[in-house]
């Protein structure tokens, strides 16, 4: 029986958004609370990776551990966050979530889990023609690859994927709803996302 863990990349202050996205309000709670509610119901263990500037605030909203990046790789982007989560929780597979996709559904994690198998290092969805490496699943064997990249100061998710045996899944092929992946980067997108969802 594989153990599944979740890693939420909460980041810190968002310059484009003007405030920490993790704490933006969403349907009566916050982005991070909504994401965690979904993840904790689908996965065995979840950890939040947060920037030191908002860690204490995030802790007030959540019931799961909130940690910072491994000191040596602090601030090295999503790869540092992912490997920090992998070090904190021992698991076979890790489902990754950014904190700015507040509309994710528990169903998504069920789909993702079903798509994993031993021969793959990662399962990455393609939504509306775009790869989504931060809404993906990674096997724990990827940890060593991430360390090797960070040591060479390579920080892009694309560089990691190029070294992995990746199973790409098109959202429409697995009945994944594109709305689950709505990604909020600016206040305009935030207003739009709230509008779109209240119209459903």
From Swiss-Prot:
Binding site for Mg(2+): 100
UniProt xrefs under InterPro entries: MobA-like_NTP_Trfase (IPR025877), Molybde_CF_guanTrfase (IPR013482), Nucleotide-diphossugar_trans (IPR029044)
Enzyme class: transferase
Domain remarks in the Swiss-Prot or TrEMBL record: The N-terminal domain determines nucleotide recognition and specific binding, while the C-terminal domain determines the specific binding to the target protein.
Residues holding GTP: 9-11, 21, 69, 100
GO CC annotations on file: cytoplasm
Cofactor or coenzyme needed: Mg(2+)
Presence of keyword Glycoprotein: no
Name under which the protein is recorded: Probable molybdenum cofactor guanylyltransferase
Function: Transfers a GMP moiety from GTP to Mo-molybdopterin (Mo-MPT) cofactor (Moco or molybdenum cofactor) to form Mo-molybdopterin guanine dinucleotide (Mo-MGD) cofactor.
Domain of life: Bacteria
Family membership noted in the UniProt record: Belongs to the MobA family.
């Amino acid at each position: 029986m594989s153990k599944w863990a979740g890693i939420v990349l909460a980041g810190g202050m968002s310059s484009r958004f003007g405030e920490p996205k993790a704490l933006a309000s969403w349907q009566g709670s916050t982005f991070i609370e909504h994401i965690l509610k979904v993840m904790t119901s689908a996965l065995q263990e979840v950890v939040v990776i947060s920037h030191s500037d908002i860690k204490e605030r995030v802790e007030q909203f959540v019931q799961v551990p909130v940690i910072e990046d491994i000191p040596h790789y602090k601030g090295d982007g999503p790869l540092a966050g992912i490997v920090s989560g992998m070090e904190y929780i021992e698991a076979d597979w890790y489902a990754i979530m950014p904190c700015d996709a507040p509309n994710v559904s528990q169903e998504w994690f069920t789909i993702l889990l079903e798509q994993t198998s031993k021969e793959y290092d990662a399962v990455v969805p393609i939504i509306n023609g775009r790869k989504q490496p931060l809404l993906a699943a990674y096997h724990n064997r990827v940890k060593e690859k991430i360390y090797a990249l960070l040591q060479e100061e390579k920080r892009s998710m694309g560089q990691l994927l190029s070294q992995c045996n990746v199973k790409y899944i098109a959202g429409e092929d697995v009945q994944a709803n594109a709305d689950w992946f709505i990604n909020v980067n600016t206040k305009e997108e935030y207003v739009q996302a709230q509008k779109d969802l209240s119209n459903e």
